[in-house]
Amino acid sequence: MGSEMCIRDSLYPAQAVNFTAYTTARNLNKSSTSLNTQIASGSTTENWRIDYVSSGVYNIVNMSDNSYLTANETKCITSSASGNSNQQWNIIGTDKDFLGNYLYYKIVNVSTGKAITYYQKDNSIGLDQYTNDGAQKWKLNCYGLEGFAANSKMIEGEKAGTIGGLLGETVFVSDMKSMKEALLRTEPLTIVLTANIDCSGENYDWMIEDNKTIIGSYQANQMRDCKLRTNDYYGKLDPSDNIIIRNMKFQVEVNPNMLV
């Protein structure tokens, strides 16, 4: 597991996530091996990576030192990767925003069945049976998003931040065929580009389905003359939503004005 993590971290910029406590501006924060919350500051100790294990099951890794969120009886700590179920978590939506997207989630340990709980009295984090209390609900805010792409207040109410394919598996693509297949998959997905792709010979637009994150790797992040769209060509389906594109360069030569 450790070697796979190092390979991934050196290959592409993984999405950092802040877990924000219910109705606050306080983020889940690593302090030594224990946890607390702090007002959002941009510190890497507030940044977490969500690693897909299997459907609905994830490792949660602190990006300051690559330590893993770990259940220890009623305590929630960080420790080195072990591969055990006490480092595996279910992330399950609880409350939706006015658009119908999940605004809050519960985070439940696979081994204990207990949820991460914020104790405001002493600013500590522990584990307890889920009771639908606000202290057990967290926003997933992708670090770096701004404006209406991020968690924001609107006239209609509070809007959840875009998370793209955060809760799906990660696939690696290196040619037109594999990229097109990944974009059309209907489940959440992080798509990592590992080779530059020249799409100038492609005659058709490419539809991006809902819930996708497209990330360029450090070694290759360019697509040439791609024609991406989020709407149905025939106008029969609703436009796609919840899409993040990071560390990508798009070059347009053959068909100017036809990038997206």
Go through each PLM region and give its residues.
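Extracellular "leader-to-stem" segments immediately downstream of a signal peptide or signal-anchor
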Residues: 141-190, 198-200
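Short, small-residue-biased leader/transition segments that mark boundaries at the very start
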Residues: 1-7
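Extracellular beta-strand-rich solenoid/capping regions of secreted or surface-exposed proteins
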Residues: 180-188, 197-215, 221-247, 251-260
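Residues within well-ordered beta-strands of beta-sheet-rich folds
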Residues: 59-61, 106-108, 192, 215, ...
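Extracellular glycan-recognition/adhesion modules and their associated mucin-like linkers
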Residues: 8-32, 47-74, 88-122, 137-142
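Trp/Gly-enriched beta-strand/coil motifs that build multi-repeat beta-propeller-like domains
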Residues: 33-34, 39-47, 81-88, 131-135
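Repetitive beta-strand solenoid architecture
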Residues: 13, 24, 31, 44, ...
